[in-house]
Amino acid sequence: MEYDVAVIGCGPAGLTAAIYAGRYGLKVIVFEGMPSQLSTVPFIENYPGFEGSGYELLEKMKEQASKYSEHAFERVVDVGKDGDWFVVKTDSSEYKAKAIIFATGGTHRELGVPGEKEFLGRGVSYCATCDGHFFRGKKVLVIGGGNTAVTDAIYLKEIGCDVTLVHRRDELRADKALQEELFKRNIPVIWNSVVVRIEGTQKVERVVLHDKIKDEDFVVEADGVFIAVGMRPQTELAAKLGVERDSRGYIKVDRRQRTNVPGVFAAGDCCDNPLKQVVTACGDGAVAANSAFEFLKVK
């Protein structure tokens, strides 16, 4: 099966790229990447013209993209080159495209502490909207200080959890508006503290924290731990084509979302762009599609 453009990833960046490329008259196929982080966001207030859950917005994007592209519900396992063609191999088929757009996003960054992996699914979670309802009326800790952590804490409070935010610094990185919502709900914050280990028997029962100011450990009883300490880019597939990445693993792109490999473009959270938001991911996708169109037009 041959296409003009293959888009790997179906979050905001990938779906926008598919819409724009399809409207340019290109034959486009979109492959599922990691589940989009947007689908787990409980509420969105900074995407112009839309207020609602991330899942609702993503479903609208998928519906629109389906008018301009094919959608393969297959996992991409490898990418390569065959002459002028890029080859995309899934767990069940093989596809060829003249250009490729990586919109693979990222996955949750781990703390790397004892008990984290052992209690995953038994009190440890990386998705408040997925697992929060299991902890109604129970005590939970949210680890982190950015937008995701604060949003998770607010959401968990709203559904009836006893929430405490734990942050390693003395001030949050989250947007001011989110911070105001957090404090308005009287959600307590444990400042200047990091997780040492997560303990329990069959499930999470307590978390050992380290106070960086006092330089001492202390214990907090908890039934759940929601970890929101950032993302790790999913760029291993792009690297197989020789695409350059920075020291953190993000794909290097120019203002046109072009990589160092002709015909290979990238968009969204997998790129080294400074701001990672839904609206910027969509912009990246549009630019990447335009660049792919210009690349194919020259060829």
What are these regions (language model features)?
Residues 3-68, 138, 148-175, 190:
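Beta1-alpha1 glycine-rich phosphate/pyrophosphate-binding loop at the start
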Residues 72-134:
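Glycine/small-residue-rich loop that forms an oxyanion/phosphate-binding "nest" at active or ligand-binding sites
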Residues 65-89, 94-97, 157-255, 294-298:
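A Rossmann-like FAD-binding core segment of flavoenzymes
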Residues 23, 154, 158-164, 281-299:
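Internal hydrophobic alpha-helix adjacent to the cofactor/substrate pocket in enzyme cavities
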Residues 11-12, 106-108, 146-148, 272:
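Residue-level detector of alpha-helix initiation sites
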Residues 107, 112, 118-134, 229-280, ...:
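FAD-site-proximal beta/loop scaffold in flavoenzymes
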